[in-house]
Design a protein with these regions (language model features):
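Short loop/turn segments immediately following beta-strands, especially the blade-tip
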Residues: 30-36, 78-85, 125-134, 183-196, ...
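Short loop/turn segments immediately following the C-termini of beta-strands
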Residues: 18-20, 67-69, 117, 127, ...
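An edge-strand/N-cap motif at the start of beta-rich repeat modules
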Residues: 8-32
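Blade-loop segments of beta-propeller domains
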Residues: 40-109
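Beta-rich, blade/repeat-based domains predominating
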Residues: 47-57, 96-107, 111, 143-165, ...
Length: 361
């Protein structure tokens, strides 16, 4: 059937890492979601610290940050030639904001955006017809601070995600304990300075002081959003409706006060949520989701390698892969679809300082 043919299509795993330009900072593997096996295909050198990336919908372009401090920070456009199994750098542009740590494509794929951690800003890049980054960019800067005297002295933009209805952009700000919300308009024509995001109608959602908002994900039913907070180690559950997030629940993912929570994802069937914790008791907290109410119940945890900054769940929900930065490895866990619990398959991929995993087809 056509459906099973789609599933037979090659599944690629893209890996971003902390790397010098002399190393292959981005690598591509084949991943077989039927058996959890992977095979290295290709890589690309020349980018400093491509620590976060996003593929285009067709998988033929990859956009990656160059997470450096200050002026040397970049956004990078890469061509992925699946026939030749080759990655080629199309072009790079400065972000004008230090330490970009997250990158995303607008729903129409006319723009790429970076969240700049040290810059406390968001950069908007229009794309040309070949998917290259144009040089005329828009920088949106923020102000403020919060409770933690070491980590919240200024804005720290950590994640930017478009809402599933494509009408808003949510930007988590670890430094000010806020989510900035921007109405989105893809077809604005009066120059790049007004493109995509409506700054005049921006509003903010405050979370508890000292939380440290990091990554956001949406439930497949689009009714709920979940935020992992790096400093408090809590997940916040929100109901979502037309740009408005209303708090449902705060629940601990990090139970040892490590202040290093990382990433958050939901299984494709919408039944389980996973959140990673670093610095102490490195691992993944597992929650079941009440899909009517949006509430979470802690159902288990899984120890991982060191510093699980980022992880991903295969499309069929069978495998959860964890980028363990300081173990220099990607662990492959099998996921029990009934209990949500994880089991290490031992099919570990050895690679230097992996910190971002994405699938494309």
């Amino acid at each position: 059937s056509a459906a099973s043919d789609v599933y037979k299509r090659q599944m690629y795993m893209l890996v971003g890492s902390y790397a010098t330009p002399e190393e292959e900072g981005i690598k591509v593997y084949n991943f077989d979601e039927q058996n959890g096996n992977s095979q290295y295909i290709s890589g690309i050198k020349g980018i400093s610290n491509p620590s976060f990336l996003i593929p285009s919908a067709d998988g033929e372009r990859i956009y990656a940050v160059g997470e450096d401090s200050g002026k040397s920070s970049t956004a990078n456009a890469i061509k992925f030639d699946k026939e030749q199994k080759r990655l080629t750098l199309l072009n790079s542009q400065p972000t004008d904001g230090g330490a970009p740590c997250y990158i995303t494509l607008s729903p129409s794929e006319k723009f790429v955006l970076t969240a700049n951690y040290m810059g406390g800003s968001i950069t908007v890049f229009p794309l040309d017809k070949d998917g290259k980054l144009k040089s005329e960019t828009r920088l949106i800067s923020f102000t403020g601070n919060s409770l933690d005297k070491e980590r919240q002295t200024q804005p720290h933009l950590h994640c930017i995600e478009f809402t599933p209805d494509h009408k808003y952009l949510l930007a988590s700000d670890l430094g000010t304990d806020q989510i900035h919300v921007f109405p989105v308009s893809e077809n604005v024509t009066d120059g790049v300075s007004h493109s995509l995001l409506n700054e005049s109608e921006e509003f903010n959602i405050k979370v508890e002081s000292g939380s440290g908002p990091r990554h956001i994900c949406f439930h497949p039913n689009q009714k709920f959003a979940y935020l992992i907070n790096e400093i408090s180690g809590k997940v916040i559950a929100f109901s979502y409706d037309k740009g408005k997030l209303n708090t449902i629940q705060y629940i601990e993912a990090d139970t040892v006060g490590a202040k290093g929570s990382g990433d958050i994802h939901i299984s494709p069937d919408g039944k389980f949520l996973y959140a990673s914790n670093r610095l102490k008791a490195d691992g993944i907290a597992i929650f079941s989701i009440n899909q009517e109410e949006g509430t979470l119940t802690k159902t288990g945890s899984q120890l991982t390698g060191i510093h699980p900054r980022n992880f991903i769940i295969s499309r069929n929900g069978r495998y959860l892969l964890v980028a363990c930065r300081d173990s220099n490895s990607i662990q492959v866990f099998e996921r029990d679809s009934q209990t949500g619990l994880l089991k290490d398959t031992g099919k570990t991929i050895k690679t230097n300082k992996p910190v971002c995993l994405k699938f494309t087809f």
